[in-house]
Amino acid sequence: MGRFVNSIHCTDDIAVVSPVLVSDKQEVQSLRNTSFPVYKHTFDIAQSGMMQRISSIHACGGYDRNLFIDSVDWEFVVRCMQHGYQTIRLNHCFLYHQIEDSNNHEINVNGHIYHTNRYEPLRYYYQYRNALYCRAKYQGSAYEFIWDEVLNGLDHAAEYETQSEEI
């Protein structure tokens, strides 16, 4: 990342530079054997390993203090894009990152028990809460679809984990 940040390609309109998050060495090998451009313009950037231009943080109003844990990064990236900044992921820079929790948890949603081994129940609460907040905040904008996708993904994950427990 340092090489890119110090290169002529890292112009003042780039607010965020991020690595690809990977979970193991096999994933790195697989990605290295695939032909990708050096970087990709994307909103799909996780805060883990993210390098941010301080001037862009100030120009975009900083982080939304209404958010906690999830969607903090994507919401900030969307605001950067709305302010005309680029947000990029370096396709040949990797960060080992484990986002899951290894314990089993029960979540009670409107009387329906979901079993999960990914996160603590409170984490799911913040994922849903923040996605709903961001969907309302960006309603009618070109970015509204992001949080619809997040909510769909959460619904499918909960459905999959429930089915896994039943098998």
Regions found by a protein language model. Name each.
Residues 42, 110-125:
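A short acidic, glycine-rich active-site loop
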Residues 35-52, 119:
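A recurrent flexible, glycine/aromatic-enriched loop bordering the glycosyltransferase active site
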Residues 90-115:
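Active-site donor/metal-binding and catalytic loop motifs
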Residues 56, 66-99:
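A short, conserved alpha-helix in the catalytic core of glycosyltransferases
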Residues 1-31:
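Conserved donor NDP-sugar-binding/catalytic core segment of glycosyltransferases
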Residues 45-67:
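Conserved nucleotide-sugar donor-binding catalytic segment
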Residues 121-137:
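A conserved mid-domain beta-alpha-beta active-site/ligand-binding segment of alpha/beta enzyme cores
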Residues 14, 136-167:
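Non-catalytic, C-terminal membrane-associated alpha-helical segments of glycosyltransferases
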